[in-house]
A protein has these predicted regions:
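Internal alpha-helical transmembrane segments of multi-pass membrane proteins
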Residues: 119-135
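Short, charged juxtamembrane terminal tails flanking transmembrane helices
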Residues: 187-197
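Membrane-interfacial alpha-helical segments at the cytosolic side of multi-pass membrane proteins
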Residues: 102-118, 167-183
């Protein structure tokens, strides 16, 4: 009887170890994936910031050329000079929106990476720590990106851009935090209904 019991315990331990190894492998893969995505976002931001004002202006000009007549009111009635001014303003808006989206992606990916270090049964502590870690990293990268632009011809370091980038970072992170909390609430509801049964 005791031998059977020991055999059953060993079998259960082996099964638990196998499940744990599979979970660790999956977590390692997800962690690696989000690390690569975070570094990819950093590289994309760096390359876009390394483009001088002329190249950056051409890129946003290409994007705004087609929608300009639709987006700008009375575009056809404006003089060529006024059209150019309006397109430049639209281009500036597109660049700011692009920057905001880049940093939104960085916030999302870096927060996802930090969340892979959180234990499943840990409720608030590590979620908050992951949030702070990702926020600190992303904002520091936004500041370093602005400092980088000092050395790029025609570009400048602007505090306003750091604020815009930080808004993008927070948007990405808050979306993810909302999804995590919703998933957690769903799991808790499922568990409580299972317990009641």
């Amino acid at each position: 009887f005791f031998q059977q019991d020991r055999h059953h315990i060993r079998k259960t331990q082996r099964k638990d170890a196998l499940v744990k190894t599979e979970k660790e492998k999956r977590t390692g893969f997800i962690r690696g994936l989000f690390l690569i995505l975070t570094l990819g976002c950093c590289l994309l931001i760096f390359l876009n910031s390394a483009a001088d004002s002329e190249v950056s202006g051409k890129q946003s000009g290409t994007i705004t050329e087609a929608p300009a007549p639709v987006v700008i009111p009375n575009y056809d009635q404006l003089s060529p000079g006024e059209q150019k001014t309006q397109k430049n303003e639209l281009g500036s808006l597109v660049r700011k929106a692009g920057h905001c989206l880049e940093f939104m992606a960085l916030g999302l990916c870096s927060f996802s990476f930090c969340l892979t270090f959180r234990k499943k049964n840990d409720r608030q502590g590590r979620l908050f720590l992951a949030f702070l870690s990702a926020l600190a990293f992303s904002v520091l990268y936004a500041v370093s990106d602005e400092i980088h632009q000092i050395f790029v011809p025609g570009r400048a370091c602007e505090f306003e851009d750091v604020v815009t980038d930080t808004m993008g970072i927070l948007c990405g992170m808050l979306v993810l935090a909302g999804l995590v909390r919703a998933k957690r609430a769903k799991e808790a509801a499922r568990q409580s209904s299972f317990t009641l049964q």
